[in-house]
Amino acid sequence: MIDIGLHSYALETSERNDGREWYLARTEGFSPTGEMALGLSGMSSAYAMHMSHLSDLRERLGEIRYGNGTDGLWVRGFTEENRLSGLGGTDLSQNVYGTSFGYDRLLDQDENNKWLLGLRGQISRAHQRVDGLHGASGDNRSYGIAAYATWQHAEGWYADTVLSWDWYDQNLKTRMLDGTPVHGSYHSYAGGISQEVGRMFRFDNGLFIEPQLQLSWYWIKGMDFTTSNGMDVDQDDAHALTGRAGLVVGKKWDLDDSRYFQPYLKGGVRHEFMGDQKVTVNGIKFTNDLRGTRGYYGAGFDLQFASNARIYAEFEREDGQKASTPWSVSAGLRVEF
């Protein structure tokens, strides 16, 4: 068996009236190089890594309503597994590890309105594997910056806006059928904006419910690259428009005048309205399509353990046909002064 371009071929024979005929017949599936390129050249990995950093306001910063200072420093780490659709019917899995960190300042507009303005940096890395016949793998590194502005109202309303810019370094590798190593790499960049709104309804016993809506747009620059054995890949730009409707239910326990513990449950749906990218591999066009609805649920908590310091953590699971996250764990620390 040999691999030529996107496909593999086996030597077969047939009987003819004038003798035996030998010919190359295409086998099912893709060649090792084709499987690698189709699994790891679409938008899926970068899209999932962006969503991990963006998440929602509560997961990203924890509970921001009960701060005791005007300036804040925070750091958050997370790890998760993604299962994603690639090009040409391929599938990939990736384990992502990331950290974000930031500084913000709380500004009083009047007695009912406050603004939290901040900047953050972020880094993450994904170890990837194509779920196919030949064991292709990859490594995607991401670096980014973001600015955010969060409006809070005394009656529980809030609105959170995030502007982000990211860079991606993608490496991919496999082996041809004869054992020859094959590799490729490309560098891309992306930008996005997100708007989240919601309202917390508080009750006298410390219980609260918080309905949320979020809409985010993300653009990923398409790049061209050639693998070490000559396979050409040409990506179009990718666009994603993701809507989310969710609900948080929790309870706040005051431990003393300056400390509290607040656990919560969350759930909702995300819908990808755009989420497709055209990629041409050796002259053949494929589409990476992530459109569809995904359901999510999770649990988390905030613990104010000192007058100016708080930890927060969350577990979440998301299920969808073309993109899913079997598990995601994050934790953060915020210090105010």
Name what the model sees in each region.
Residues 1-27:
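Extracellular, surface-exposed repeat/solenoid domains
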Residues 26-205, 314-316, 321-326:
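Outer membrane beta-barrel translocator domains of Type V secretion systems
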Residues 90-92, 126-139, 168-191, 218-243, ...:
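Extracellular/periplasm-exposed beta-strand and loop segments of Gram-negative cell-envelope proteins
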Residues 99-105, 145-151, 165, 193-199, ...:
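Residues on the lipid-exposed face of transmembrane beta-strands in outer-membrane beta-barrel proteins
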Residues 109, 203, 219, 230-337:
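Outer membrane beta-barrel transmembrane domains
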Residues 212-213, 237:
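Short, well-ordered beta-to-alpha junction loops that form the rim of enzyme active sites
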